[in-house]
Amino acid sequence: MSRLLLAPMEGVADFVMRDVLTSVGGYDGCVSEFVRVTGSLLPARTYERETPEIRNGGYTASGTPMVIQLLGSDPEWLARNAAQAATVSPHGIDLNFGCPAKVVNRHGGGAMLLATPELLHRIVSTVRAAVPARIAVTAKMRLGVSDTSLAIACATALAEGGAASLVVHARTRDHGYRPPAHWDWIARIADAVRVPVVANGEVWTVDDWARCRAVSGCDDVMIGRGAVSDPFLALRIRGQMARQPSDAEWPLVLGCLADYLKKLRARIAIHHEHGRVKLWLGYLKRTWPQAAELHDAIRRLQDSAEILGVIEHALARIGQQSAPAG
């Protein structure tokens, strides 16, 4: 069976979301939201805040290995911070060359680096030299900034710079998250480099996963928004749940939501829990129409305890409806 990896998603796949989704099961690994590196050495408390998995040996509560992702554009500062991160991230260091966010790109980070393959090579080689050999250094990239003209050059620069593997998101920065994903370009990249390539982009269903593998030629797939829209997608791919979502699974989804909110409330460093739950419901609406109804029910609520009460009431009501008549 190929590997299934949970993608880093800034503002979405935080520590608690990683905990909940990997607890559902099916993932072989996950990557943190990016830790931004500028012109300083980050203190240890930054990693403790952003990636609490380090207190568990780099694993989520369910035992899924987590890799810390760094984002920046200065080779030396990235290397110094990677060396420090490697002391608490035994499963690897990932470098972000794919973030399309304007706030990141205007500082020359993320996907903007795909305009300069030589800088990509320098970053990866400098980081690789600074990190112990036992710690894998990997990279995540897109197909380019505005077009694919440098896609092969960028992938080659990363691989030759020392990246142990590449995750390729099959769109350019300018394409954002608009379909389609160009999985055929992943195949071209995989043919051009001598390191493993992981396919990423527009995998929402089991059928998407199968087509992605067939077109890209990659065994391993990283899933992002599809994992948030369907928490059971990895299990479906592995044949451990029904291939297609159904209304009968909605109580399980409510259980995931309740678990997520309870864990958010327990995290002192997390604020605005109500906004995060509403954000997740926005993704879930793609798979379950009931999510739209629940979103409407909590739309104006600001208190997380009230929202939890609505979720638990919905669960209780389903239980009453399914109970045999006495």
Curated annotation (Swiss-Prot):
Note the site residues: Interacts with tRNA: 36, 96, 177, 276, 278, 283, 299
Annotated binding of FMN, by residue: 8-10, 69, 140, 200-202, 224-225
Enzyme class, first EC level, given as a word: oxidoreductase
EC number(s) given by UniProt: 1.3.1.-
Q: Which UniProt keywords apply?
A: Flavoprotein, FMN, NADP, Oxidoreductase, RNA-binding, tRNA processing, tRNA-binding
Name the needed cofactors.
Answer: FMN
Catalytic activity annotated for this protein?
5,6-dihydrouridine(16) in tRNA + NADP(+) = uridine(16) in tRNA + NADPH + H(+); 5,6-dihydrouridine(16) in tRNA + NAD(+) = uridine(16) in tRNA + NADH + H(+)
Give one GO molecular function term: tRNA-dihydrouridine16 synthase activity
Q: Which residues form the active site?
A: 99 (proton donor)
Q: Which InterPro entries match?
A: Aldolase_TIM, DUS-like_FMN-bd, DUS_fam, DusC, DusC_C, tRNA_hU_synthase_CS
* SUPFAM superfamilies in the cross-refs: FMN-linked oxidoreductases
Question: Which Pfam families does the entry link to?
Answer: Dus
Q: PANTHER family, alphabetically?
A: TRNA-DIHYDROURIDINE SYNTHASE, TRNA-DIHYDROURIDINE(16) SYNTHASE
User: Main role?
Assistant: Catalyzes the synthesis of 5,6-dihydrouridine (D), a modified base found in the D-loop of most tRNAs, via the reduction of the C5-C6 double bond in target uridines. Specifically modifies U16 in tRNAs.
What the record says about family reads:
Belongs to the Dus family. DusC subfamily.
- Please state what the protein is called: tRNA-dihydrouridine(16) synthase
Record the organism. Ralstonia nicotianae (strain ATCC BAA-1114 / GMI1000)
Q: Which gene carries the instructions for this protein? A: dusC
